[in-house]
Amino acid sequence: METKQTYSFDEAFQASLAYFGGDELAARVWVNKYAMKDSFGNIYEKSPEQMHWRIANEIARIENKYKNPLTAQEVFDLLDHFRYIIPAGSPMTGIGNNYQVASLSNCFVIGLDGNADSYGAIMRIDEEQVQLMKRRGGVGHDLTHIRPKGSPVNNSALTSTGLVPFMERYSNSTREVAQDGRRGALMLSVSIKHPDSEAFIDAKMEEGKVTGANVSVKITDEFMQAVVEDKTYVQQFPTNSSEPSVTKEISAKALWEKIVHNAWKSAEPGVLFWDTIIRESIPDCYADLGFQTVSTNPCGEIPLCPYDSCRLLSLNLYSYVIDPFTDHARFDMELFKRHAQLAQRLMDDIIDLEMEKIDLIMSKIKTDPQVDEVKSAEYHLWEKIKKKSCQGRRTGVGITAEGDMIAAMGLRYGTQEATDFSVDIHRALALNAYRSSVTMAQERGAFEIYDAKREEKNPFILRLKEADGQLYEDMKKYGRRNIACLTIAPTGTTSLMTQTTSGIEPVFMPVYKRRRKVNPNDTDVHVDFVDEVGDSFEEYIVYHRKFLTWMEVNGIDTQKKYSQEEIDELVKRSPYYKATANDVDWLMKVRMQGEIQKWVDHSISVTVNLPNQVDEELVNKLYVEAWRSGCKGCTIYRDGSRSGVMISVSKKDKTKDEKPVDEEKAKDLNSAEEHHEHICNHPNVIEVRPKELECDVVRFQNNKEKWVAFVGLLEGYPYEIFTGLQDDEEGIALPKSVTKGKIIKQTAEDGSHRYDFQFENKRGYKTTVEGLSEKFNPEYWNYAKLISGVLRYRMPIDHVIKLVGSLQLKNESINTWKNGVERALKKYVVDGTSASGLKCPVCGQETLVYQEGRLICTNCGASRCG
């Protein structure tokens, strides 16, 4: 067997850094996530160029099976430098990669036929979910078939528990599989007509519950009409039965207000406008043949029937703008149309490659050492997926860089002019993707259940007919290769490599600030900050890559170090002004999604980002507007509504008495300066941990055991925490007089890391305790890593304490340990910080503040130890 060359991480990183023009984040993401590796971590690709040749050669191999094949060079030219066509993560990693037995599909939906709410059926779905996740797939499934709480059952429980406990089961399975590099992503959905839908909507409001799943409610037009008209609504089970066993009359408006409140408070549930999805769905023209849509993938952009799957690919819209950011910028529509047809063709080739991967998976299952009774469920699962994939040959051609394309054309995201332009682009994409699918039907054959008669009244097909009559006639004559073709996904890390905005979204921030450690004796650096241990740091501005291009095109010095005021002025002059994720016109963004949705046969994944201080009424308006505009789904995120997510830093502290954004301002969209601090004033995050950190030593009792916590400090702020037993043969022997020291990160020759603690004794001699992490119970160590992660990214300490307190842990010992960690961290809370959400146990008022690590009531003076 041929021995392939391997590369060290540094070799691959340096080569990729040059490939991406010095973009460290893009290079690091590519090496970590997409470079071909084996199970031992050996790296077989030095740069994305080698990856693109790997993909091009495999696609060309498939092309040679059919008429008019593309060459490997032609495919490579489409992929090179992520310029035109970008396969999504699973295809990019898996195509031509024989070191992993994994699927090329990004998304799956599962669900059993018939009466599927028995324990056996629920366990089978749980198993199938895990089996798909371990092969890289994101999974969605619907819970509408589960009997509502209190329904009679023929087992020892006598009545059904309802669907919420099973949400937690499926969520925990996802969290379990999403470890050690495996992927876990889950969507759970339920119909608003289900009697337990309110419990489903509330399930994630309790901290620590259903944390491994996204949840969305399938909303019907009937329900929305009842909301608008403030009428009652009847829920029932089964939801589609003419003779339901359970009925329940509710106030539609009250339940809707709960959806709105929960979305405002925690960003979930998302809403799926289910009647719109089904009405527009081409696969549902074949519902009786097994293509009835039941749920979506985790991000919501691909509604699917059970056991169908989809692979994703994006066109980089920015690359089709000629002379970007100039007065004569124009979009190369002819090149785009040609590439849209080729993108659809490449997607069809990837289906053939996926069939090969599924065969490999099934072959591996057969040869696994387990007994057939264990293996048969997974084998049968992949049989069902292969059959459905062959029947429909579903694809997910989409786009990225919409926000940058709009800016490069001199338009402002969120205006009617920009929306009209985007609609033209997506109409062209739809017509040419479908044209390509018809051409492939002539050359390769139509998907096996194609029937023009079934589709003739479908609204999407009728729009194609109106826009291009010849395409429609050819489709009736020759058929179509793919049952559905289009989507718009959140392109995530792939947009880091295209160095553009993600998917259909606007730019998140055009400018932000980072800090790096420097040698103060180096004449080429400027020291902006010196920490308490004497380390020097230089602050530097990071520009969104296309904002930098705008500066260059307009003759603005990109090397100059600008003041905050100068940066503000630059942003105001640019096409990105009032067009970022947080200050775009929200209602126009929703309307834009609805307009574009008319030319996307699957769905669109979009998040509407809102400032922290908006009220629930705005969320209500956005959701109702999304329904009326023809969106298939909608998700909102209010800044700061989820702990652990970095929030915008306000110019002034927001108080409970501050008025929400009024309606007129919400319509007109105030500038970022009115609602949030400018983009450059986020907390500073040090990208690379310094080798040494100052450390506080905090001791506490865990049951009857003596424990010690080592709190690493950066700029006086907790950065990491280590915990372990004291005075034990396997623990940490430490004099009681030691209260401070240093945590030193050591790197071994093999690249692995360990953390040592060093302190000075009373005589001034240094003592080093090696390998802190090796001295801890792995369960405690994993929780300590979680806590260190949020500390590192500067979540406020009082929020970290709240997060630690919300951890749902298994036994008394680890819960006592958790309480000790909370006490250790409370000493770092700034005196006077309000303990939001906590009431004084004496007077019952919400007037507790932190003072010297204790909670003090400002109303009655009571105090208690943290």
Regions found by a protein language model. Give the residues of each.
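Short, Gly/Pro- and small/polar-rich lid/capping loops
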Residues: Y472-D474, S650-V711
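Internal maturation/activation junctions in enzymes
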Residues: F76, F237-P238, H339-K386, C390, ...
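Catalytic alpha/beta core of large soluble enzyme barrels
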Residues: E24, V294, G300-I302, E354, ...
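Function-dense linear segments that define catalytic or interfacial modules
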Residues: M36, E58-K65, L78-N155, L163-F166, ...
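Cysteine-rich micro-motifs
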Residues: G853-S863
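Cys/His-rich microdomains that often coordinate metals
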Residues: E846-L848, S863-R864
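Short cysteine-rich clusters marking metal-coordination/redox-active sites
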Residues: C840-C843, C857
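Conserved, charged catalytic cores of large soluble enzymes
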Residues: E2-Q73, N155-R169, Q179-F291, I322-T326, ...
